[in-house]
From Swiss-Prot:
It is found in: Mitochondrion. Keywords: 4Fe-4S, Iron, Iron-sulfur, Metal-binding, Mitochondrion, S-adenosyl-L-methionine, Transferase. [4Fe-4S] cluster 2 binds at C137, C141, C144. It catalyses: [[Fe-S] cluster scaffold protein carrying a second [4Fe-4S](2+) cluster] + N(6)-octanoyl-L-lysyl-[protein] + 2 oxidized [2Fe-2S]-[ferredoxin] + 2 S-adenosyl-L-methionine + 4 H(+) = [[Fe-S] cluster scaffold protein] + N(6)-[(R)-dihydrolipoyl]-L-lysyl-[protein] + 4 Fe(3+) + 2 hydrogen sulfide + 2 5'-deoxyadenosine + 2 L-methionine + 2 reduced [2Fe-2S]-[ferredoxin]. GO terms for cellular component: mitochondrion. Belongs to the radical SAM superfamily. Lipoyl synthase family. HAMAP family: Lipoyl_synth. [4Fe-4S] cluster 1 binds at C106, C111, C117, S352. Binds 2 [4Fe-4S] clusters per subunit. One cluster is coordinated with 3 cysteines and an exchangeable S-adenosyl-L-methionine. This is Lipoyl synthase 2, mitochondrial. SUPFAM superfamilies: Radical SAM enzymes. The keyword Transmembrane helix does not apply.
Length: 379
């Protein structure tokens, strides 16, 4: 996993004025969201390392791309070097994870942003990404460092309650629930994930919940279970361009299947924000990235993140290219032009990166205020 717009069925007797009014309302919402985001901090405030000025990476003379057949690994450029995570909140969350036997993708996937996310960072939005259903995946994607097995241990029936209890005590603003793939289970673990969402919301309805979920092998009943669980953001990563998908992802993961999952999630629950992520540096071309972004927009995806692929161990795919911050900025601008609610694009950006969660929180809070105002006007 880590990392198709079907038309809604309508009846001909529905008056055109209803559709027109709905379209107008959606346009107003979109404009208001854009305005709100414009007033907030720029995305570069989150991803730019203050110790690395523009001139430093512009003048970098190291090699950024491996040639075909070349075996030697590329040297890590300066803009990808991060500090060791520290801080009270970081230590608190890590300790409680151990106590409750919970896994986080932040640790399992060796995310470079763990200290900033768990600690709250400059903008104070504390986030964490919990990995449900254990630390062992039934798939073997060539970019991912999570353990794999054909038949992982059984699910922990106490995990939904333990997870919700921990999250409620942390005082987080935004939580991301992700999971390993569990192809060994009839429902892929979808009911387990949905139960966890409901437990979290029962304890604190103000926490925004994002679920970064598997494709469930295209099983739409599983997609519907998650979409209607009470979550706020439905995320499923396309990971790479179509041409590289068979080479990068597990053979059971398919590019078009991912697009269908994202499309159907929105159909099952039109109020959801949908989100996906693309890794760069695996040998893709600009034309292929452009095509992937357009496919995601056609699938109705609201938010997209683009980040640098980093080889987790010597056993995984080597980095073909280190993409410059300037190029990531280009894709951020291109994503905005294509109509995504936000495009998070930077070398250290990951699908669960806290800056993206800050922006999505703004969107969700805005929606909640509009909904409350509408309810008050009816009274």
């Amino acid at each position: 996993m880590f990392g198709m717009l079907r038309a809604l069925k309508t009846h001909v007797e529905v008056p055109i004025v209803v559709a027109t009014r709905a379209a107008s309302t959606n346009a107003e919402k979109l404009e208001e969201i854009r305005e709100r985001l414009a007033k907030g901090p720029n995305f570069q405030d989150f991803v730019q390392n203050p110790d690395n000025s523009r001139s430093e990476w512009e003048n970098y003379e190291g090699k950024l791309r491996r040639e075909k057949g070349e075996e030697q690994r590329l040297r890590l450029p300066p803009w990808l070097k991060t500090t060791i995570p520290v801080g009270k909140n970081y230590a608190k969350i890590k300790a409680q994870m151990r106590e409750l036997k919970l896994s986080t993708v932040c640790e399992e996937a060796r995310c470079p942003n763990i200290g900033e996310c768990w600690g709250g960072g400059e903008h104070g939005t504390q986030t964490a990404t919990i990995m449900l259903m254990g630390d062992t995946c039934t798939r073997g994607c060539r970019f991912c460092s999570v353990k794999t097995a054909r038949k992982p241990p059984p699910l922990d029936v106490n995990e939904p309650v333990n997870t919700a209890t921990a999250i409620a005590s942390w005082g987080l603003d935004y939580i991301v629930l992700t999971s390993v793939d569990r192809d060994d289970l009839p429902d892929g673990g979808s009911k387990h994930i949905a139960e966890t969402v409901r437990e979290i919301k029962a304890r604190n309805s103000n926490i925004f919940v994002e679920c970064l979920v598997p494709d469930f092998r295209g099983n739409l009943e599983c997609v519907e279970t998650i979409a209607n669980s009470g979550l706020d953001v439905y995320a499923h990563n396309i990971e790479t361009v179509e041409k590289l998908t068979p080479y990068v992802r597990d053979r059971r993961a398919h590019y078009r299947q991912t697009l269908q999952v994202l499309t159907e999630a929105k159909r099952f629950n039109p109020n959801l924000i949908t989100k996906s992520s693309i890794m760069l540096g695996l040998g893709e071309t600009d034309e292929e990235i452009e095509s992937t972004l357009k496919d995601l927009r056609t699938a109705g995806v609201d938010c997209v993140t683009l980040g640098q692929y980093m080889q987790p161990t010597n056993k995984h795919l080597k980095v073909i290219e280190y993409v410059t911050p300037e190029k990531f900025k280009h894709w951020e601008e291109r994503g905005n032009e294509l109509g995504f609610l936000y495009t998070a694009s930077g070398p250290l950006v990951r699908s669960s990166y806290k800056a993206g969660e800050f922006f999505i929180t703004s969107i969700l809070e805005n929606r909640k205020k509009r909904q409350n105002a509408t309810e008050l006007s009816k009274e």
